Amino acid sequence: MPKLKTKSSVKKRFKITATGKVLAGPGKKRHNLSARSQKAKRQNRGSQVLTHADGLTVKQWAPYGLN
C-alpha cells in the first residue's frame, strides 16, 4: 500500500503538541487591522488549541504527524 500524503495546507497552519493537542494560529491578522481595536489585536496573538473534533480532522490530514 502506498504512503499517505500530508496536506500541505495543514503543514503550514497547524502544530501537534507532544500530548496530541492541535495548535493553530488565529486568523484576521493580515489586513484591515486599522478597523480592529488594539485590545482585539493584542488578544489575537499566540496560538489557540483546537476543539477535539477539529483536532481529529486535522490529524486525519496529517497521517504521520507534523514535524
Swiss-Prot record:
Keywords: Ribonucleoprotein, Ribosomal protein. The keyword Ribonucleoprotein applies. GO terms for cellular component: ribonucleoprotein complex; ribosome. One of its GO terms (biological process) is translation. Residues 22-52 are annotated as: Disordered. Residues 27-44 have a biased composition (Basic residues). It comes from the Bacteria. InterPro entries: Ribosomal_bL35, Ribosomal_bL35-like, Ribosomal_bL35_CS, Ribosomal_bL35_sf. Gene3D superfamilies: 4.10.410.60. Pfam families: Ribosomal_L35p (PF01632). One of its GO terms (molecular function) is structural constituent of ribosome. Belongs to the bacterial ribosomal protein bL35 family. This is Large ribosomal subunit protein bL35. It comes from Granulibacter bethesdensis (strain ATCC BAA-1260 / CGDNIH1).
